[in-house]
């Protein structure tokens, strides 16, 4: 009854108005699963490759009809009749069918859509919520949200080089409370930005994108918003940064246009980040060095790795082979988990498990181009990842994940826990 009997792929639009892939999987029992894949703006060089049409006459070349065609033909034929309850076998079939390391032949967007939709169909047939289907019946932790309130870099048109400045409600006692704190700070920040005569327009991920003089001015604005919302910076709400450093790393230098064109070596940039961490309650830095600057990553880890979460995104691209190398070299202490960087759920879960075994944290993440699909919320709870990064407190594509987490916490009731600072077990 779990046999796959139909697969339907289609082209839909993401939160930026760009095409992406959606997939429906129908089982013999009548159960159905639907999933849509996200897409990133700043992407790592080693990510699995999404297949785009390149036809400039449609969607500026960003159409995904080729990926959809692959889904409706070759992928459909390979998965037809397989047991949807056997996720690992389904994903292995997809990986072998594509036959490339980067999933470029059939497209990571096509493979991931199938992988996710199969899981949703199997959960539907089992009568289970997706997080229970993935994670079993044991106690589960709700994730600490890393809420992007000020955007810069590739996610906004302003003076900031760093891509995200985030708030982390580590002092809350439940996810529901953490979400409320974040929303209240978001609205306090909006009022402050408006009061200073700056635009309150939001970036791709729902955060504001004000033209502040420099990064410290942005940090200070957030701290003021936290205080005005009635919370204590640090003990109740900490800060996080996503530098996306590969975006401004050229010829061995980190050039910060938002800091007056400052050009820094890896050590100098590490020193700057360390200075900010000493001055402000920053407990997490993502992509603090460029993806190819492994020496810089080692410097940063040696300097800050005991007191700040150092998250590898472009560095690791949710890939166990690269993560293993990072663990062996003592680089970073956390991995960002993006399902479309690797292309199947099985490989995603393997990366989370490898990180945990090594004492690294795993932060489940959205992409800048999102949909109403909320699978990552279920993954964060099912794997006890304890941290999620899914944007600001605006835009329905971001709220879809937060609202799903509210539902999950309600369903789990007393068996749900909110870890707060304990989510950062890599800093013990």
Swiss-Prot record:
Family from the record: Belongs to the enolase family.
GO cellular component: cell surface; extracellular region; phosphopyruvate hydratase complex
Cofactor: how and how many bound: Binds a second Mg(2+) ion via substrate during catalysis.
InterPro entries: Enolase (IPR000941), Enolase-like_C_sf (IPR036849), Enolase-like_N (IPR029017), Enolase_C (IPR020810), Enolase_CS (IPR020809), Enolase_N (IPR020811)
Record: residues binding (2R)-2-phosphoglycerate: 163, 338, 367-368, 389
Pathway annotation: Carbohydrate degradation; glycolysis; pyruvate from D-glyceraldehyde 3-phosphate: step 4/5
UniProt EC number: 4.2.1.11
Catalytic site: 205 (proton donor), 338 (proton acceptor)
GO molecular function ontology, one term from the record: magnesium ion binding
Cofactor(s), names only, from the UniProt record: Mg(2+)
GO biological process terms held by the UniProt record: glycolytic process
Name this polypeptide is given: Enolase
Gene that specifies this protein: eno
């Amino acid at each position: 009854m779990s046999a796959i009997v139909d697969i339907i792929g289609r082209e839909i639009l993401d939160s930026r108005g760009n095409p992406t892939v959606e997939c429906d999987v129908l089982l013999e029992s009548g159960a159905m699963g639907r999933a849509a894949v996200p897409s990133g703006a700043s992407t790592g060089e080693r990510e699995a490759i999404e297949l785009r049409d390149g036809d400039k006459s449609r969607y500026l070349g960003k159409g995904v009809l080729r990926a959809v065609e692959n889904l409706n033909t070759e992928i459909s034929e390979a998965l037809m009749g397989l047991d949807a309850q056997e996720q690992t076998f389904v994903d292995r079939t997809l990986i072998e069918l594509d036959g490339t390391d980067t999933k470029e032949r059939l497209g990571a967007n096509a493979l991931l859509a199938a992988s996710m939709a199969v899981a949703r169909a199997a959960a539907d047939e089992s009568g289970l919520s997706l997080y229970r289907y993935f994670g079993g019946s044991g106690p589960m932790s709700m994730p600490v949200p890393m809420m992007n309130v000020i955007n810069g870099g590739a996610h906004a048109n302003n003076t900031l080089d760093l891509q995200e400045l985030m708030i982390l409600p580590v002092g809350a006692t439940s996810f529901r409370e953490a979400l409320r704190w974040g929303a209240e700070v978001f609205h306090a920040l909006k009022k402050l930005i408006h009061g200073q005569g700056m635009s309150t327009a939001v970036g791709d991920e729902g955060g504001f994108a004000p033209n502040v003089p420099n990064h410290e001015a942005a940090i200070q604005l957030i701290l003021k918003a936290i205080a005005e919302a009635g919370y204590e910076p640090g003990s109740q709400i900490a800060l996080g940064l996503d530098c996306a450093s590969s975006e401004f790393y050229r010829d061995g230098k980190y050039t910060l246009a938002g800091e007056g064109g400052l050009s820094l070596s890896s050590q100098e940039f590490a020193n700057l980040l360390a200075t900010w961490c000493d001055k402000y309650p920053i407990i997490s830095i993502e992509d603090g060095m460029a993806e190819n600057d492994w020496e810089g990553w080692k410097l940063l880890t040696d300097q800050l790795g005991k007191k700040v979460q150092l998250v590898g995104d472009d560095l690791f691209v949710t890939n166990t082979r690269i993560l293993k190398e990072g663990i062996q070299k003592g680089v970073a202490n956390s991995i960002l988990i993006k399902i479309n960087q690797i292309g199947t759920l099985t490989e995603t879960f393997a990366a989370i498990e490898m990180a945990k075994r090594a004492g690294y944290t795993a932060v489940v993440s959205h992409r800048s181009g999102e949909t109403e699909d909320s699978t990552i919320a279920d993954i964060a709870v099912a794997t006890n990842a304890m941290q999620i990064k899914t944007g600001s407190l605006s835009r329905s594509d971001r709220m879809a994940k937060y609202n799903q987490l509210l539902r999950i916490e309600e369903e789990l009731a007393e068996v749900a826990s909110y870890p707060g600072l304990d989510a950062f077990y890599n800093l013990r």
